[in-house]
């Protein structure tokens, strides 16, 4: 008989609001028991009954920032799997138009951060993948991210195809226990346990 796993499924939205080449980032430092404790993320939250992704993100942004979005794009669907015990389907948005006055957020501290400096923040490894996709203006995408119980990224797939993952090493060649996607490794210049070999074909002048 086929084994059926019953997993808790959540629905959520996340939005990165852009202004003057900066993203509005939320530093999650308020709640003690927070899976995102000390991480930097975008603005968003879980669906309320009967909401569409657009209705959810508009409400969450208003509640957490005080802003009303006037121009936004639905960029992708991110599937999170946490240690085979919980799943989350997250609708990812970006916005470049808003109005209203900012308010304090009870989820953390809001801060405008230069987009190029976002990579230096304490981010989830999977978030770096969709940041790269956003930076490259990839059309609407489906991204799957699988995490261990310890919060380590173990697997990623883009539009149903597995992405290449590298084990990051330190300067002495020792494993760090961190796994990064190929594009993120190249973006950050991280050391990894692979080597690239180029073969030169002799020409007439080489003898």
Question: Model-found features: residue ranges?
Answer:
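Residue-level signal for well-ordered, solvent-exposed loop/turn and beta-edge residues enriched
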Residues: 22, 73, 152, 172-174, ...
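Short, active-site-adjacent segments that bind or coordinate small-molecule cofactors and metal centers
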Residues: 134-154
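Unchanged
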Residues: 47-70, 80-134, 155-163, 204
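Acidic, metal-coordinating catalytic segment for phosphate/diphosphate chemistry
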Residues: 2-14, 161-204
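Conserved hydrophobic "DFG−1" position in protein kinase catalytic cores
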Residues: 17, 25, 94-95, 112, ...
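Conserved Nudix-box catalytic region and its N-terminal flanking loop in Nudix hydrolases
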Residues: 23-59, 63, 149, 153-160, ...
């Amino acid at each position: 008989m086929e084994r059926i796993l019953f997993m808790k499924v959540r629905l959520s939205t996340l939005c990165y609001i852009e202004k003057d080449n900066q993203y509005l980032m939320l530093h999650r430092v308020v709640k003690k028991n927070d899976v995102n404790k000390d991480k930097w993320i975008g603005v968003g939250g879980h669906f309320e009954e009967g909401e569409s992704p657009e209705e959810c993100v508009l409400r969450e942004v208003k509640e957490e920032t005080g802003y009303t979005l006037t121009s936004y794009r639905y960029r992708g669907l991110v599937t999170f799997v946490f240690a085979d015990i919980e799943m989350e389907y997250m609708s990812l948005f970006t916005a470049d138009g808003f109005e209203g006055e900012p308010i304090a957020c009870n989820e953390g501290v809001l801060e405008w951060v230069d987009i190029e400096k976002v990579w230096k923040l304490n981010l989830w490894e999977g978030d770096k993948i969709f940041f790269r996709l956003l930076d490259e203006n990839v059309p609407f995408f489906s991204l799957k991210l699988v995490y261990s119980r310890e919060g380590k990224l173990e697997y990623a797939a883009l539009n149903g195809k597995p992405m290449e993952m590298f084990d990051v090493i330190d300067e002495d060649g020792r494993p760090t226990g961190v796994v990064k996607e190929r594009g993120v490794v190249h973006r950050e210049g991280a050391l990894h346990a692979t080597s690239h070999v180029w073969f030169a074909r002799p020409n007439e002048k080489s003898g």
